[in-house]
Each structure stands twice: as structure tokens, then as C-alpha cells.
Amino acid sequence: KKTMIFTDEDVRYLRMSKAILADQTDAILDVWYGFVASTPELVASFKNNKTGAPDAAYLAAVRKRFAQWILDTADANYDQAWLDYQYEIGRRHTNPKKNQTDKADSVPSVNFRYLSALTIPVTTTLKPFLAKKGASPADVEKMHAAWVKSVLMQTILWSYPYVREGQF
């Protein structure tokens, strides 16, 4: 949090964003899933090993968790339970835990480079949704900045399983 310059003000603006985003999660996910679907390198993480096509059931299961992740990010406590869950999310992107939660037959791991790279499309496309409910431009900017910090912090934590012991 210190390295990210993540402050109590950021937490306050994330909390403010929850009421704005709560009824927009489906629309947000439509944008994010559209981006993933149009990017072969990303959609490959959801392909069925037998058919080579994106696994619709797997995508739907992940979508439910992704909707909850939006709300959880806006309402996170940043305590030990939160930290432990971030590490679990990281493990679920890597072998051997990827595919276990959803019993999917897909690639064994999400390539490391996509974790932090996805911070940009996720947070950039979120900004218009933050502006939809009449928040002041200054509040939208502060909510957006808080989201950028939080998402990057989370993706850094998710990268833990990819990094050599002692190098994280």
C-alpha cells in the first residue's frame, strides 16, 4: 500500500464507487469480456482443450466471480483475509490450481504478462461507468485513481506464484 501511495482517501473513494458501480456490473463485464473475446491471446486462457473453442460454461463461471470482484474491490478491508484471498486468486491463475474451481478443461496457466497488462483496459474502461451517476468530475478522477491503484496492487499480489522464491 505504501509503495502504491494507496491511502485512506483511496479507500474512501473506492467505497464511494461501490454505490455507483453496483448496478452496472453486467454492463462493465460486457465491455471487459468484449475486450477479452477480441484479443486472441486473452481468450486463449478460456479455451476448451478438447474443442479449442472458448468454454462458455467456464467464461460464465468466471464472470460471476468477476462481478463479485468489482464489488469486493470497492468494499475491500485490506486485512489479512483480503491478502490471503489475493494470493488464492493468483494461485487460481497458475498450475496446478487453474481450472480446479470451475472444473474446466483449459490451459494450465494464464501467462504472467497478462496480469498487470490487464490493469490498463480494466481501469480505463471503468472510468465512464464511474461518471454515469452524477459524481463530480473531481470525484470521478479520485475514484478512478483509487481503482487504478487497487487493481494494480491486486495484480501485483496475484503475480506472487509466478515469481521465483525470494524475488517477490
Question: What is each of the regions a protein language model found here?
Answer:
Residues K1-K2, A22-F129:
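Heme-based O2/NO sensor domains and their adjacent alpha-helical segments
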Residues K1-R12:
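Charged, compositionally biased N-terminal leader segments and the immediate start
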Residues K1-T3, K132-F168:
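Short terminal or interdomain "cap/linker" segment that borders an active site or interface and mediates
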Residues M16-A19:
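Short, motif-level signal for alpha-helix interfacial/capping segments enriched in acidic residues
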